[in-house]
Amino acid sequence: MLNFKIFILLLILFFNGKIFAYGTYSEGWANAKILQFESRGLVFESYEGIIELSTFSTDEKCDEEKDECYTITKQKIPFSVRPENGETVNLLMKSLNQDLVINYRIHRIESITLSSVTEVIQALNPLTSIPAELESDKLIVSKTGSKRNFSVSGKILRLEYQGVIIGTFEGLYLDEVRGRVHPFSVTDEKMANYAWITMKSSLKCNLGISVAFATGFRKSNYDLFEINYIAPAGGVYK
């Protein structure tokens, strides 16, 4: 009898995972262009589309010491939205070929109610001012690198929390002066949350980047230690 109950419990967990997305590999925010969006399915209806994200090629030969890395390239990614997420569906429907800020999840196992592992759970039109959610126009945390520390004028294009057992914050920033993008990590959770809020605005800001000799568990040796809307990052403050 006990074995039967365990079997039923496992069965419920299995199907619940399949229908409602069993686990999440990563979740974050990104600036995305909406290329396609439509309704699909009969039994399990969902909304499916294609977004375009900024990215780069790791094969590019460039000099990081001279801030020449990397040239911006574009990547097309299929995504899904659940039909009960009406507000997001409606905004995406009227935003074809436009840039939005999206909140997304990448699932480890594709749900039978969705046609892709990338699920958009929220979409926003970019603000034209500093987000009211921010308590200050700058945030500074401890530097983690001793190789280089510098300021970049631009904005964050993508930032997500990745991993299942050991998670890290990984992102991509745009250097508007040089017209380059570069991957970076965030080792401070408060900074990651602050960065996510700044992404809701189209305003550029100053990003403080600390470069370490080693990456540790994170994917990039570039670490974000400051976001500043009023002055270059890395200044001296009392």
Indicate where each model-derived feature is located.
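Short boundary/loop segments of OB/S1/cold-shock single-stranded nucleic-acid-binding domains
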Residues: 19-26, 132-148
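Classical Sec-dependent N-terminal signal peptides that target proteins to the secretory pathway
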Residues: 1-21
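Flexible glycine-rich surface loops and low-complexity tracts that mediate binding to linear polymers
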Residues: 93-113, 197-219
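Intrinsic-disorder/low-complexity, polar/charged segments enriched in Ser/Thr/Lys/Arg/Asp/Glu/Gln
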Residues: 27-29, 76, 99-101, 149-151, ...
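Structural detector for short beta-strands of small beta-barrel domains
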Residues: 26-43, 147-166
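OB-fold (S1/OB) nucleic-acid-binding surfaces
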Residues: 44-79, 166-186
